[in-house]
Amino acid sequence: MALLEICCYSMECALTAQQNGADRVELCAAPKEGGLTPSLGVLKSVRQRVTIPVHPIIRPRGGDFCYSDGEFAAILEDVRTVRELGFPGLVTGVLDVDGNVDMPRMEKIMAAAGPLAVTFHRAFDMCANPLYTLNNLAELGIARVLTSGQKSDALQGLSKIMELIAHRDAPIIMAGAGVRAENLHHFLDAGVLEVHSSAGAWQASPMRYRNQGLSMSSDEHADEYSRYIVDGAAVAEMKGIIERHQAK
């Protein structure tokens, strides 16, 4: 049966995902940045309360995946922290200036991660040569690759995802970006074994007083009185689709 991973941005969201049938959580901060390293407090609270596997993302900033020496030092420290806290896996990725996997840096990450299952995230979708990159990731011992097939969403990239799945000795290929209940059957019918979804919604802030003339964001149009949450009903619906597909 296909595995359902849900991207979560808080302990509460991780618990919601777990309660509604998620098989694994990718734990992140900063949804508008596409996911950054969670705080130590969030990591500890999730580790204590969530019982399904949780893989934190290790990404120090938004934007590209070519990092300064200081940023890379922070990545290694965060990898060590996640390992020490007892998480079973993590999610990360580093590219060089030419859009290839930065092999020397990824080798250091793999050494720091030790026995943890490492997912190479959607930095893969920004690489110059996906099949060459897939070979490099297999050589590193990467457990899985999260990808949209190098398109803006995974449904558009499904043909590339299928090509990657068919590649000999490839890591597990996990489809992600725009995967939701209404299109999930396309991925299941194609033989995708792991799917990644935010199953998310924006929830209004409980604050009654709102200073509408002030923004804490560099984006003056950002709605600071809404929060990104996991929609438990959406998770349960996706899990049900997977179970029914398996029973066919």
UniProtKB/Swiss-Prot annotation:
GO terms for cellular component: cytoplasm. It comes from the Bacteria. InterPro entries: CutC-like, CutC-like_dom_sf. GO terms for molecular function: copper ion binding. It is found in: Cytoplasm. Pfam families: CutC. Keywords: Cytoplasm. Belongs to the CutC family. Homodimer. PANTHER family: COPPER HOMEOSTASIS PROTEIN CUTC, COPPER HOMEOSTASIS PROTEIN CUTC HOMOLOG. This is PF03932 family protein CutC.
